C-alpha cells in the first residue's frame, strides 16, 4: 500500500525515495517493558519513529520532517502529544494538514487518487501494539521519564536503520 501511495505522491512532489524501516520489533520491546506506562506507548512509538526519520533526513540532506498528521484524528495527534513527540528531534516538523478538517482531507485524497489505496484493509503495527487507553494529553516530563526505561533504545534505532530498504 505504501509503495502505491508514494508513487502517486511523487507526481506532486518530484523525486521521491521511500525509506522502509522495520519498526514492529521496537514496538514489541516497548510494549513488553513493564516499567513503561501502557498509556504512553503510542507517544513513545512516535518519538522513536521521529528519531529514525530524523537520522534518515540528515542522511538525505533534508532540512525537516513532513507528516500527514491532522489535529485530533487519533490519540497521538493532540497538541500536547505532538509537542511531546516533536521534542524528540532537533529538526523542524511540518504538518501541512494539521488544521484541515478530516472530510476535506478525505476529499483531497480522492481527488489525487490515494483514498482507495489508503482504505484497503491493512494490519499496521501501531494497531497491533495499541494500549487500551492511549494518552491524549502527554506531559513531556512523564514521557521522558518513561523513555529512560528504554535502556537499549539507541541500539534499536541503529538496528532498524541498518535494515532499512530504500525504494526509488
Language-model regions, residue ranges each:
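ATP-dependent adenylation/nucleotidyltransferase module used to activate substrates
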Residues: 1-111
Amino acid at each position: 500500500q505504501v509503495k502505491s501511495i508514494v508513487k502517486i505522491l511523487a507526481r506532486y512532489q518530484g523525486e521521491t525515495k521511500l525509506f522502509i524501516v522495520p519498526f514492529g520489533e521496537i514496538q514489541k520491546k516497548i510494549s513488553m517493558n513493564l516499567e513503561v506506562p501502557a498509556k504512553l506507548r503510542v507517544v513513545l512509538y512516535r518519538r522513536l519513529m521521529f528519531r529514525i526519520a530524523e537520522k534518515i533526513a540528515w542522511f538525505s540532506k533534508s532540512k525537516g520532517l513532513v507528516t500527514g498528521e491532522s489535529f485530533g484524528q487519533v490519540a497521538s495527534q493532540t497538541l500536547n502529544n505532538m509537542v511531546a513527540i516533536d521534542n524528540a528531534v532537533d529538526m523542524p516538523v511540518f504538518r501541512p494538514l494539521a488544521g484541515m478538517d478530516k472530510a476535506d482531507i478525505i476529499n483531497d485524497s480522492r481527488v489525487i487518487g490515494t483514498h482507495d489505496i489508503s482504505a484497503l484493509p491493512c494490519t499496521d503495527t501501531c494497531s497491533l501494539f495499541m494500549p487500551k487507553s492511549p494518552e491524549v494529553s502527554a506531559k513531556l516530563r512523564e514521557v521522558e521519564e518513561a523513555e529512560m526505561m528504554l535502556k537499549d533504545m539507541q541500539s534499536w534505532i541503529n538496528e532498524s536503520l541498518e535494515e532499512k530498504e530504500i525504494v526509488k
